[in-house]
From Swiss-Prot:
This is Ribosome maturation factor RimM. It comes from Anaeromyxobacter sp. (strain Fw109-5). It is found in: Cytoplasm. GO terms for cellular component: cytoplasm; ribosome. InterPro entries: PRC_barrel-like_sf, PRC_RimM, RimM, RimM_N, RimM_N_sf. The lineage of its organism: Bacteria, Pseudomonadati, Myxococcota, Myxococcia, Myxococcales.
């Protein structure tokens, strides 16, 4: 059962054990089970989502087993995962991060830039980490000049001057 990364716990919210999750792109509104994974840990068990609501730029998520602020703070830094089959389809112009990793990145002229090897959450515009064929890295913001073609299995960039230098 494939697990998809929905985001990361960045802080505790309130006093009742809500986790402040960044990067979920709204998937937490519908998913009923998530897993929290700290770096270096094996696959964690799924936990029931008791409540999920938007909280500014974050999602405030309450799960079984986390009932106060102290226990929520213990999860700061953990990845939030869900089973692929528990998630709705991403829809047009939407995507899950796991759908992007491994995709080739090309310019609108068809020139190869590299392969998506990671993503950064910046709080505003997420940034693709693109590893070039030479082994270098390019950071490409998911801005209007980037088209994610999940069906075509590629990312197309119309880079502004200087982006790829």
């Amino acid at each position: 059962m494939a697990r998809i990364r929905l985001g990361k716990v960045v802080r505790a919210v309130g006093l009742k054990g809500h986790l402040g999750v960044a990067g979920s792109e709204g998937a937490l509104a519908t998913v009923r089970r998530i897993a929290l994974r700290r770096e270096g840990e094996p696959e964690p068990p799924l936990q029931e989502v008791l409540e999920a609501r938007p909280q500014g730029r974050l999602w405030a998520v309450r799960i079984e087993g986390v009932s106060d602020r102290t226990s929520a703070e213990a999860w700061v830094g953990a990845e939030v995962l869900a089973l692929r089959e528990d998630l709705p389809e991403a829809g047009e112009a939407r995507h899950y991060w796991a759908d992007l990793e491994g995709l080739p990145v090309v310019t609108v002229a068809g020139a190869a830039i590299g392969t998506v090897t990671g993503l950064y959450e910046t709080g505003g515009v997420d940034v693709l980490v693109v590893t070039t064929e030479e082994g270098g890295e390019k950071l490409v913001p998911l801005a209007p000049y980037v088209e994610v073609d999940v069906a075509g299995r590629r990312v197309v960039v119309d880079p502004p001057e200087g982006l790829l230098d």
